[in-house]
Amino acid sequence: MLPAANIGDLFLIGTGGFIGASLRYTISSRMPKIRSIPAGTLTVNFLGSIVLSLLTFSSEPESVVYLVNIGILGSFTTFSTFAYETFKLLEDGQNVSFFLNIFLNVILCLLGVGIAYFALRL
């Protein structure tokens, strides 16, 4: 677990967040859907998973974690964290937790979207 962030760490996170959100918008807005699949979202989630995993598995310094993992990738995609944590469960031999994590994330996120969708239609 990372220690509590100071103002410099928060600046790195905020700067990274600006970069990640800008990249996500740029990529997602320029890619067409492929057979109804939002290719932009799929692309940023896939790339984010790769980059987050590469940085996490390589034990980068805290400043890189704040800027890239939390800042850039946190706003670029949250799926990268989900993918990494789910893979880690499998790697650690926690097979039931691996499948349960996938199930709960997918179902709860879809449920949340459904709740918001129907709440806005009332």
From Swiss-Prot:
Chemical reaction(s) catalysed: fluoride(in) = fluoride(out)
Keywords carried by this UniProt record: Cell membrane, Ion channel, Ion transport, Membrane, Metal-binding, Sodium, Transmembrane, Transmembrane helix, Transport
Domain of life: Archaea
Transmembrane annotation, as ranges: 1-21, 37-57, 64-84, 98-118
One annotated Gene Ontology cellular component of this protein: plasma membrane
Mode of membrane association: Multi-pass membrane protein
Mechanisms controlling activity: Na(+) is not transported, but it plays an essential structural role and its presence is essential for fluoride channel function.
The name this protein goes by in its record: Fluoride-specific ion channel FluC 1
Species per Swiss-Prot/TrEMBL record: Methanosarcina mazei (strain ATCC BAA-159 / DSM 3647 / Goe1 / Go1 / JCM 11833 / OCM 88) (Methanosarcina frisia)
Gene: fluC1
